[in-house]
Amino acid sequence: MRELKNTCRAAIVQATPVMFDKARSLEKALRLMDEAARNDAELIVFPELFLPGYPYGMTFGFTVGSRKADGRQDWKSYYDNSLLSDGPEMQQLIDRAAALGVYLSMGYSERDAVTGTLYNSNMMIAPDGRAMNHRKLKPTGSERVVWGDAQQDYFPVMDTPWGPMASLICWESYMPLARVALYQKGISLYISPNTNDNPEW
């Protein structure tokens, strides 16, 4: 049986992205990864939807039964700044994690290359280049205007020196059976990125 490391030095990033700007947000993420690694982080965890930011309080012009034109433009801007799970931005994160020798958890808005659907996703990346994507199963409340329900890529478990690692996104951590699904896989590290500072977190 493999001997697991007893401790993990984790850097929990509490920073604001450059909203609706994936290029500048990615630059900031890479700088923060470098800083965390200089401070001996082994695991770096970013918030929910760090790339390209959580559109907190935005309506995207939506009311029940109608949408406004300016809201559609807001949504299009957000869509254009969402990332492909296997796109060049994600590859930059994979490459940087490898160069730094760290594990990474990155919250991002994923754009599906086939369907065009957006997903609230979290990518776990290992220093050997492995990348495992988790899509939020059911967006919370009005998030459903922006992101779709996961049909694949959920509950992946990544092997790490500290044991199996997995993630649930924000409100998913309130779902007992979602947690049970991870516990049944024997996880040692449970990452639950969110985007706010509500008292329950």
Enumerate the language-model features and the residues they cover.
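N-terminal active-site segment of His-dependent metallophosphoesterases
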Residues: 1-43
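Short, basic, glycine/proline-bearing loop/turn elements
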Residues: 13-20, 72-82, 161-165, 189-195
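Active-site catalytic loop in hydrolytic enzyme cores
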Residues: 3, 84-85, 89-98, 110-189, ...
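Acidic active-site catalytic centers that drive phospho-/nucleotidyl reactions
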Residues: 14, 48, 172
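Charged active-site motifs of nucleotide-sugar-dependent glycosyltransferases
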Residues: 8-9, 43, 103, 164, ...
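Cys-nucleophile CN-hydrolase/nitrilase-fold catalytic domain and related Cys-dependent amidase chemistry
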Residues: 22, 34-127, 197-201
